[in-house]
Amino acid sequence: MRKIILCSPRGFCAGVIRAIQTVEVALEKWGRPIYVKHEIVHNRHVVDKLREKGAIFIEDLQEVPRNSRVIFSAHGVPPSVREEAAERGLIAIDATCGLVTKVHSAVKMYAKKGYHIILIGKRKHVEIIGIRGEAPDQITVVENIAEVEALPFSAQDPLFYVTQTTLSMDDAADIVAALKARYPRIFTLPSSSICYATQNRQGALRNILPQVDFVYVIGDSQSSNSNRLREVAERRGVTARLVNHPDEVTEEILQYSGNIGITAGASTPEDVVQACLMKLQELIPDLSIEMDLFVEEDTVFQLPKEL
């Protein structure tokens, strides 16, 4: 019988849960409005629900009245934003994911030691902007192998590299291999900069790909890790669609006769996954459902001390 294979883990990671709870608890404790620098996570459903509860999402701290509370999103901010918040008398609450903070700390430490840092990631992504702000004169962002080949450093230069936490492990591995080929002495953190949740979700998806011929990645188009999941499937020759609403699950699926895989980005609520699953079952009523467990997750991050 044709079946749906549900990846596990999928959806919310510990950093996203912490960020969302930070906004919710702040609203309960201090009431509305609570200002949030950038979307707390990259998912429209999450942001809309928090906005209804009284969160105000802003990009410019000038929009925040003096002496108000402002939450920094899970993606992190550059030091200049923290400084501006302090100058304006804002009460800052940091919802930056701990794994992003780890990368910030490493960049600061190695920049102080005189290393030039190669930062692998999407240069316009808010996480990369935040990390780069730690040492802008000592950081070079690379997005692909061509940019590695264009780097001006010698093999003897002191170099350190880190990656955006939500990258495709496939792409990151290719870029790192190119870096090490040019700069054999370059090194990184003992553990990967790519976060556990990104690795687990990509691993869970890779695990089911030999069994399916179509994949739905439930996630927002702005979500880096959701887009990387789609690319993981496509790189292995499996058709994949990134959808964020049941209406985007269309009759296109009727063109495919094999099993269907479903996963979700780390900022995707489970109720959106279930709504998309129900729509799929309406289109193909005789589908059975199978859960494929890749690894159990038990990571929990504590809320900011202010809460």
Curated annotation (Swiss-Prot):
Full protein name: 4-hydroxy-3-methylbut-2-enyl diphosphate reductase
Keyword check for Iron-sulfur: yes
EC number from the UniProt entry: 1.17.7.4
Stretch forming the signal peptide: none
Record-annotated disulphide pairs: none
Catalytic activities: isopentenyl diphosphate + 2 oxidized [2Fe-2S]-[ferredoxin] + H2O = (2E)-4-hydroxy-3-methylbut-2-enyl diphosphate + 2 reduced [2Fe-2S]-[ferredoxin] + 2 H(+); dimethylallyl diphosphate + 2 oxidized [2Fe-2S]-[ferredoxin] + H2O = (2E)-4-hydroxy-3-methylbut-2-enyl diphosphate + 2 reduced [2Fe-2S]-[ferredoxin] + 2 H(+)
MF (Gene Ontology): 4 iron, 4 sulfur cluster binding; 4-hydroxy-3-methylbut-2-enyl diphosphate reductase activity; metal ion binding
Pfam families per UniProt: LYTB
Organism: Chlamydia trachomatis serovar A (strain ATCC VR-571B / DSM 19440 / HAR-13)
Binding locations of dimethylallyl diphosphate: H42, H75, H125, S223, S224, N225, S267
Binding site for isopentenyl diphosphate: H42, H75, H125, S223, S224, N225, S267
GO BP term, example: isopentenyl diphosphate biosynthetic process, methylerythritol 4-phosphate pathway
